[in-house]
UniProtKB/Swiss-Prot annotation:
Induction description: By heat shock.
A GO BP annotation: collagen fibril organization
Top-level taxon in the UniProt lineage: Eukaryota
GO cellular component annotations of the record: endoplasmic reticulum; endoplasmic reticulum lumen; extracellular space
Name of the gene: SERPINH1
Signal peptide bounds: 1-15
UniProt motif (Prevents secretion from ER) ranges: 402-405
Protein name: Serpin H1
Similarity comment: Belongs to the serpin family.
UniProt-annotated location(s): Endoplasmic reticulum lumen
Native species: Gallus gallus (Chicken)
Length: 405
């Protein structure tokens, strides 16, 4: 039997929880496990020599693993939990914890960001979804169930891509151009995220600059500039800079990690783990920083199947071993693809800034953070301490400017 599962997470937060509402131990635990997943999966992907830009939402990938666990049995289910470092937790704990975490972090109203997330399950015309699976998957991961005829591949792909575009208000026009295997389960995450800065960039402080993809290849990008007080650390030993920019409502922030000079990110990526992030955070101090960032319109679609397999999800993707029988009651499904598609934009938009700050002593002699070459970034949620997105910008959109020798 063939089934096509399109998973993203749209409208998970139906109500706005109070900012001081305490998370349950379940949600806190799953937030912690999703952070571990963030670094594990990022490193697995960064090993791919053909990979350029990376854009992941660890909490959304965690929900995909939760869904595999929900629809699987025996080792198929336990491996999904193990990749999430949740194999010691019972099923109800995992599903309810993820549900609460996702409802919290996807509350874009409370966080004053734009986060479009959608959720759909496609199956063939012949499938009968198990009632318990439909009920529990909707309860915990909030997605609809639909059927699709993949005998007409062109029409099916068009339907999936149009759904993704509609879900993201046209920001994500395409999830995939093709699906090679059409006899297995297909997971697709589709989302659009746009941060709203705590202090905006002035719209007139934008000009065209060069972004050095490599020392010999430069593209033109719109670069925006502002000076403000930010948490900042200059790691002289590792020859890199770390800066944290709060987003509106200060419930989340963007962290940028950039080597001092243009170079492959491999050296910096080898340093990247949660303990190193804590170390950098402990050394950051609020000070004046002159920041130049490219305006970003980033659209990335990853097939995570291989990378999740590298982390231990091997049985669900094996046609001869997978047991996803809780989805339909039949043991003839396997996971053929895990597409994780996201669009990310940031520009000058944000809250008004206090112009009086520029006369203060503390604003003198700002540090320079000039992001004109590849860097790593994270979007971190302050309440749950989870990483909403992790990625790297290696090749932004832009026309080639020149070759350099």
């Amino acid at each position: 039997m063939q089934i096509f599962l399109v998973l993203a997470l749209c409208g998970l937060a139906a109500a706005v929880p109070s900012e001081d509402r305490k998370l349950s131990d379940k949600a806190t635990t799953l937030a912690d496990r999703s952070t571990t997943l963030a670094f594990n999966l990022y490193h697995a992907m960064a090993k791919d020599k053909n990979m350029e830009n990376i854009l992941l939402s660890p909490v959304v990938v965690a929900s995909s693993l939760g869904l595999v666990s929900l629809g699987g049995k025996a080792t198929t289910a336990s491996q999904a939990k193990a990749v999430l470092s949740a194999d010691k937790l019972n099923d109800d704990y995992v599903h309810s914890g993820l549900s609460e975490l996702l409802n919290e972090v996807s509350n874009s109203t409370a966080r004053n960001v734009t986060w479009k997330i959608g959720n759909r399950l496609y199956g063939p015309a012949s499938i009968n979804f198990a009632d318990d699976f439909v009920k529990n998957s909707k309860k915990h991961y909030n997605y609809e169930h639909s059927k699709i005829n993949f005998r007409d591949k062109r029409s099916a792909l068009k339907s999936i891509n149009e759904w993704a575009a509609q879900t993201t208000d046209g920001k994500l026009p395409e999830v995939t151009k093709d699906v090679e295997k059409t006899d297995g389960a297909l997971i697709v995450n589709a989302m659009f995220f746009k941060p709203h800065w705590d202090e905006k960039f002035h719209h007139k402080m934008v000009d065209n600059r060069g972004f050095m993809v490599t020392r010999s290849y430069t593209v033109g990008v719109p670069m925006m500039h502002r000076t403000g007080l930010y948490n900042y650390y200059d790691d002289e030993a590792e020859k890199l800079q770390v800066v944290e920019m709060p987003l509106a409502h200060k419930l989340s922030s963007m962290i940028f990690i950039m080597p001092n000079h243009v170079e492959p990110l491999e050296r910096v990526e080898k340093l990247l783990n949660r303990e190193q992030l804590k170390t950098w955070a402990s050394k950051m101090k609020k000070r004046s920083v002159a920041i130049s960032l490219p305006k970003v319109v980033l659209e990335v679609s990853h097939d995570l199947q291989k990378h999740l397999a590298d982390l231990g999800l091997t049985e669900a993707i094996d046609k001869t071993k997978a047991d996803l029988s809780k989805i339909s009651g039949k043991k003839d499904l396997y996971l053929s693809n895990v597409f994780h598609a996201a669009a990310l934009e940031w520009d000058t938009d944000g809250n008004p800034y206090d112009a009086d700050i520029y006369g203060r002593e503390e604003m003198r002699n700002p540090k320079l953070f000039y992001a004109d070459h590849p860097f790593i970034f994270m979007i971190k949620d302050s309440k749950t301490n989870s990483i909403l997105f992790i990625g790297r910008l290696v090749r932004p959109k832009g026309d080639k400017m020149r070759d350099e020798l």
